[in-house]
Amino acid sequence: MRLNTLSPAAGAKSAAKRVGRGIGSGTGKTCGRGHKGQKSRSGGGVRVGFEGGQMPLKIRLPKFGFTSRKALVSAEIRISELAKVNGDVIDLNALKDANLVTRNIQFAKIVLSGTIERPVTVKGLKVTQGARAAIEAAGGKIEE
């Protein structure tokens, strides 16, 4: 088998509709757009969400919630990802050096997901109860 001998299965691809090629084709003259009107013009059509002047659904529904500014600079780290960090001490800079979080992250929390085999010391990071138990069970410790 060679790449130049490959072809799609029979019936898998249909030919593109050729419009404006005579009345016998079924899509001649108006090309399936009907007569006149906004949608028949080139570039014609209404924007997404426009409902013909009726108050759109997006505006009929009430506003709710907000976007937390702290969420933009916070990250969650899984226990299993700690294996990628070189060294025994894990802090925010160690996570950044291991490319586990981006440079703009200011807060990180370690959550229990996966396992950890080697003892590590976690400094200055928040840790969930389950993650704390797993780290201490592996012989590690948490320092605030």
Swiss-Prot record:
Ranges annotated as spanning the membrane: none
Residues covered by region (Disordered): 1-49
Gene name of this polypeptide: rplO
Gene Ontology BP annotations: translation
Role this protein plays: Binds to the 23S rRNA.
Keyword RNA-binding: yes
Species whose genome carries this gene: Shewanella pealeana (strain ATCC 700345 / ANG-SQ1)
Any GO CC annotation of this UniProt entry: cytosolic large ribosomal subunit
UniProt KW keywords: Ribonucleoprotein, Ribosomal protein, RNA-binding, rRNA-binding
Taxonomic lineage from the root: Bacteria, Pseudomonadati, Pseudomonadota, Gammaproteobacteria, Alteromonadales
Pfam family, one: Ribosomal_L27A
Residue ranges with Gly residues bias: 21-31
The protein's name: Large ribosomal subunit protein uL15
UniProt record similarity statement: Belongs to the universal ribosomal protein uL15 family.
Quaternary structure note: Part of the 50S ribosomal subunit.
Molecular function terms, GO-annotated: rRNA binding; structural constituent of ribosome
